[in-house]
Amino acid sequence: MVQSCSAYGCKNRYQKDRNISFHKFPLARPEVCVQWVSAMSRRNFKPTKYSNICSQHFTSDCFKQECNNRVLKDNAVPSLFTLQTQDPFSADVCFPLNVCATAEPLSECFPEQCGLPDGQEAGAVSCPEQCVPPGGQEAGAVSCDHNYTLEDCVQQKRRVQRLQEQMEKLRRRMKTLQQKCRRQERQLERLRANRGPAPLGDRYVILPRELYEELQGVETIGAVH
């Protein structure tokens, strides 16, 4: 699955020719993970093992300098979430935003409407849903919130269905083998029941040893005479 950024309004996806790296949420460190989610300012967002944030939302001091690859420090927290997001690694990289052209500029959004404290500029944070003009625009042009969790759920559902089908095939195969084993066991029991002592026939007679020796002596005397 192609890696994509979970930040609000960010449309970055993994491409080899772009100097952008993607970093997974530190789910193993809950305290740092909470700081990441809080910095994103996304309501009802729950990161999964497939969620990523691109390197454009981290300052250069968040990365380990001694590593050849782009590796985050243990206490690194993303902080670049303004609409004028800058890439600390490459100034030539374009950072597109899918914002409707007919939407009202942020300068016309008052701090009281956006829930901002007095003295804070509106351009420093993302404007919430109350400042988005209702109706008249396509939903895909206004809402840039994406996490691709729906795609993950669909893939997981398909995988579960495939596993269930494989299990059903294995159950049927096991049942067939069990029936075959039972038939072979019954056939073996019938063979054992039918097997008896081998018939001696008309040419063989069972005699005591003493009588056999006497008869053998009589035959010897007859042969001499």
UniProtKB/Swiss-Prot annotation:
Q: Which gene encodes it?
A: thap1
List the SMART domains hit by this protein, alphabetically.
DM3, THAP
Tell me where in or outside the cell this protein is found: Nucleus, Nucleoplasm
What keywords tag this UniProt record? Cell cycle, Coiled coil, DNA-binding, Metal-binding, Nucleus, Transcription, Transcription regulation, Zinc, Zinc-finger
What Gene Ontology molecular-function terms does this entry list?
Answer: DNA-binding transcription factor activity; RNA polymerase II cis-regulatory region sequence-specific DNA binding; sequence-specific DNA binding; zinc ion binding
Read off the InterPro entries from this record: THAP1/10, THAP_Znf, THAP_Znf_sf
Which residues lie in coiled coils?
A: 149-196
Q: Which family does it belong to?
A: Belongs to the THAP1 family.
Please provide the Gene Ontology terms (biological process) for this protein: regulation of transcription by RNA polymerase II
Lineage of producing organism? Eukaryota, Metazoa, Chordata, Craniata, Vertebrata
- Matches recorded under SUPFAM superfamilies: Glucocorticoid receptor-like (DNA-binding domain)
Pfam families cross-referenced by the UniProt entry: THAP
PANTHER family per UniProt: SI:DKEY-228B2.6-RELATED, THAP DOMAIN-CONTAINING
Name of the protein described by the UniProt record: THAP domain-containing protein 1
Q: Where are the zinc fingers (THAP-type)?
A: 5-57
Biological role stated in the UniProt entry: DNA-binding transcription regulator that regulates endothelial cell proliferation and G1/S cell-cycle progression. Specifically binds the 5'-[AT]NTNN[GT]GGCA[AGT]-3' core DNA sequence and acts by modulating expression of pRB-E2F cell-cycle target genes.
Species, as recorded = Danio rerio (Zebrafish)
GO CC, sorted alphabetically, is: nucleoplasm; nucleus
Q: What is its main location?
A: nucleus
